[in-house]
Amino acid sequence: MAEAQYRGTGRRKNSVARVRLVPGTGKITVNDRPIEEYIPFANLRQVVVQPFGVTETNGNYDVIANVNGGGFSGQSGAIRHGIARALLDVDPDFRAPLKKAGLLTRDPRMKERKKYGLKKARKAAQFSKR
């Protein structure tokens, strides 16, 4: 029989991550590359492993993530969301600490659209009273 696999889908901004957790040593692979190579910023790599810290499961699972859309920040958040959801499959008792840390909530903040007549979403040409 194949070893246990736990799946979770995470989303953040315009990124979608499909995450698999496999019992292992804590190796994280994103789009077939090690996380150190894929995400160049240490603070964003810390974001990715947050769910393991909250549930005290550091180094217990290997993570295989496929992520597309968005940039580094959105993709890191999407992977974190996917890992948190997959950990619920591992043990439903993880729900309380993950929810308390806010890791199960899909962050609804999105980029605001640009409006016509303005330079950006809210940036307008300088106003002249006279």
From Swiss-Prot:
<dbReference type="InterPro" id="IPR000754">
    <property type="entry name" value="Ribosomal_uS9"/>
</dbReference>
<dbReference type="InterPro" id="IPR020568">
    <property type="entry name" value="Ribosomal_Su5_D2-typ_SF"/>
</dbReference>
<protein>
    <recommendedName>
        <fullName>Small ribosomal subunit protein uS9</fullName>
    </recommendedName>
</protein>
<dbReference type="GO" id="GO:0003735">
    <property type="term" value="F:structural constituent of ribosome"/>
</dbReference>
<dbReference type="InterPro" id="IPR023035">
    <property type="entry name" value="Ribosomal_uS9_bac/plastid"/>
</dbReference>
<dbReference type="Pfam" id="PF00380">
    <property type="entry name" value="Ribosomal_S9"/>
</dbReference>
<keyword id="KW-0689">Ribosomal protein</keyword>
<keyword id="KW-0687">Ribonucleoprotein</keyword>
<dbReference type="GO" id="GO:0022627">
    <property type="term" value="C:cytosolic small ribosomal subunit"/>
</dbReference>
<dbReference type="InterPro" id="IPR020574">
    <property type="entry name" value="Ribosomal_uS9_CS"/>
</dbReference>
<dbReference type="GO" id="GO:0006412">
    <property type="term" value="P:translation"/>
</dbReference>
<comment type="similarity">
    <text>Belongs to the universal ribosomal protein uS9 family.</text>
</comment>
<dbReference type="GO" id="GO:0003723">
    <property type="term" value="F:RNA binding"/>
</dbReference>
<dbReference type="InterPro" id="IPR014721">
    <property type="entry name" value="Ribsml_uS5_D2-typ_fold_subgr"/>
</dbReference>
